[in-house]
């Protein structure tokens, strides 16, 4: 089984942060401390999720947990851990990211899309992505 975490950040939701079947990708690689908390962003591949450096149809499972904040202060822990969307281009960025996830996913594969509605509603996200989910949380 081949797994891709396309926006791994500091791998917060992973129990096994070094899973042998997983390729961890993020646009940044850095370690720092903010408000007394250590943050380590250590991907296997440093790349943007919009033009992924992978062949088509190679992953059985893709996790797409992109940044969800459009605005954050310079000392925001959430921004430090998860990154930040561009407030003007986020719809196109998310659309491109979802398209890339589907491109690298095998036809029989599974995509897990994780979203936080703190600043952008799920409804707004669903309006810009090219593929609609089969199931999920309908609160948005």
Feature-to-residue mapping (PLM):
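Class I S-adenosyl-L-methionine-dependent methyltransferase catalytic core
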Residues: 1-140
